[in-house]
Swiss-Prot record:
Transmembrane intervals: 12-32, 47-67, 86-106, 124-144, 165-185, 206-226
Keyword Coiled coil attributed: no
Organism whose genome encodes this protein: Lactococcus lactis subsp. cremoris
GO molecular function term, any single one: endopeptidase activity
Record-linked Pfam families: Rce1-like
Function: The function of this protein is currently unknown, but it has been shown that it is not necessary for phage resistance.
Subcellular location, record wording: Cell membrane
Protein name, entry field: UPF0177 protein in abiGi 5'region
Record-linked InterPro entries: Rce1/LyrA-like_dom
Keywords of the record: Cell membrane, Membrane, Plasmid, Transmembrane, Transmembrane helix
GO BP term, example: CAAX-box protein maturation
Family statement: Belongs to the UPF0177 family.
Length: 232
């Protein structure tokens, strides 16, 4: 009994790191362009980097989705499309945008240091075409991050309250590190974790996360124009 308990812990701990290894695999080409693309410059370099990255990303997505499917991570996904669940997700997404808008505006008014995620995004755009960055943040990030920080962490911890706290803090910290921008990512993480915590349906948090990431560059400037709030 005790042995099975610790084997289960080891299984999900290993799975957490495996999912992130697969998730970050395509970023090798972004992290070391001077090694892989040393002889290329300008547009030619960007084209080659983009195709290599897309190839690696396709492999990563296939492996990640396959692993999660085999482990039953996507069970009850169809239930998302019930009217009451769609309405809940729509309202939650709107709330998420509003919370992010105010926390992000406050952060920009008082701090200038970018977080890890923002720095990585700015760097990657210099190497591959912008549409690749969009695919990464709107599709890859939600699939891998939600699987790791929601279902895997909830499977690792027997106590749901501990799992909730670790999921919220861990997700936010992964994006920011020891940085004041944590005040932006922590509320976002709490909302996404709460979505998963409600029914334990991974597809719901993936959907909201993906829509949020995809529309963020449009919604935030729009809210700034509508409210007139650029600083808090």
């Amino acid at each position: 009994m005790i042995k099975n308990h610790w084997m289960k812990k080891l299984k999900y701990l290993s799975l957490f790191f495996l999912l992130f290894a697969i998730y970050w695999f395509p970023d090798v080409i972004l992290a070391y362009p001077e090694v892989y693309l040393k002889s290329l410059v300008g547009y030619e370099r960007q084209v080659v980097a983009t195709w290599i990255f897309l190839g690696n990303m396709s492999i990563s997505l296939f492996l990640g989705i396959l692993i999660c499917y085999k482990l039953g991570y996507y069970k009850n996904t169809i239930s998302i499309f019930k009217i009451k669940n769609l309405l809940f997700l729509l309202i939650t997404t709107i709330i998420l945008f509003v919370i992010y808008f105010f926390s992000y505006t406050y952060y920009n008014s008082h701090f200038i240091t970018p977080g890890i995620a923002k720095t990585q995004a700015a760097f990657s755009i210099q190497i591959v075409f912008p549409f690749v960055q969009f695919i990464t943040i709107a599709i890859c990030a939600p699939i891998f991050e939600e699987a790791s920080f929601r279902t895997t962490i909830y499977s690792f911890f027997k106590n749901d309250k501990i799992a909730y706290i670790v999921s919220c803090v861990g997700f936010a910290w992964m994006h920011t590190g020891p940085n004041p921008i944590l005040i932006v990512y922590l509320p976002m993480s709490i909302v996404l974790t709460s979505i998963y915590h409600r029914r334990r349906v991974l597809g719901e948090s993936i959907l909201v996360h993906g829509v949020f990431n995809a529309l963020l560059p449009i919604v935030i400037p729009l809210l700034q124009v509508i409210t007139g709030l650029y600083y808090l």
